[in-house]
UniProtKB/Swiss-Prot annotation:
GO terms for biological process: sodium ion transport. NQR complex catalyzes the reduction of ubiquinone-1 to ubiquinol by two successive reactions, coupled with the transport of Na(+) ions from the cytoplasm to the periplasm. NqrA to NqrE are probably involved in the second step, the conversion of ubisemiquinone to ubiquinol. It comes from Vibrio cholerae serotype O1 (strain ATCC 39541 / Classical Ogawa 395 / O395). The modification FMN phosphoryl threonine is found at T225. Pfam families: FMN_bind. This is Na(+)-translocating NADH-quinone reductase subunit C.
Amino acid sequence: MASNNDSIKKTLFVVIALSLVCSIIVSAAAVGLRDKQKENAALDKQSKILQVAGIEAKGSKQIVELFNKSIEPRLVDFNTGDFVEGDAANYDQRKAAKEASESIKLTAEQDKAKIQRRANVGVVYLVKDGDKTSKVILPVHGNGLWSMMYAFVAVETDGNTVSGLTYYEQGETPGLGGEVENPAWRAQWVGKKLFDENHKPAIKIVKGGAPQGSEHGVDGLSGATLTSNGVQNTFDFWLGDMGFGPFLTKVRDGGLN
């Protein structure tokens, strides 16, 4: 009888030990996978920023090298448009927007982009050419038909002229609203003026196509009116006083160099 009890105890010990070992292995693998996913996400973000800046990079090593050499993240106070101190490289604006102490809840009138909350501080990316800043990259986002759409827009140091646009995260309908990622559509933005002569937001997404030579007009997305409206609303918000408007005013007045 004692022999049977010993056998059962040994079996239970082996089962428990194996379970513990397996759980440790699974936990370690999950942590490793999560870290790898974060690393890949950061690398993809750097790649998109370089792309919109017009800097070609091939392979992860070159992406990191060129990003560190050519891009300077800075924090901006949305209320004043001033640079503020802080760890811009690791700042999570999405997370900050969810924290009541680090953000504001937008009123229905303010919330043109339908983002609900806006962080108090935003991150911008300065494209460096030696000691000089050649462009500034703004992260913008707004609601489309099916998804929140995230983009980077590169602006010349006049604070007005677009030099590039890339949508890097969106869930719109492929072939319709998803065409925000189409290189041909994005190319239309280059050279467009964000503001009119009175420094008011002026970019317009035009259903049926923008007039030839329009300074402010971009063709609407065919068959995707609501996504096009989402793009319009995104820029209306982020170019305004609640977004990067105060910062771009300072850029226009020579605040970068």
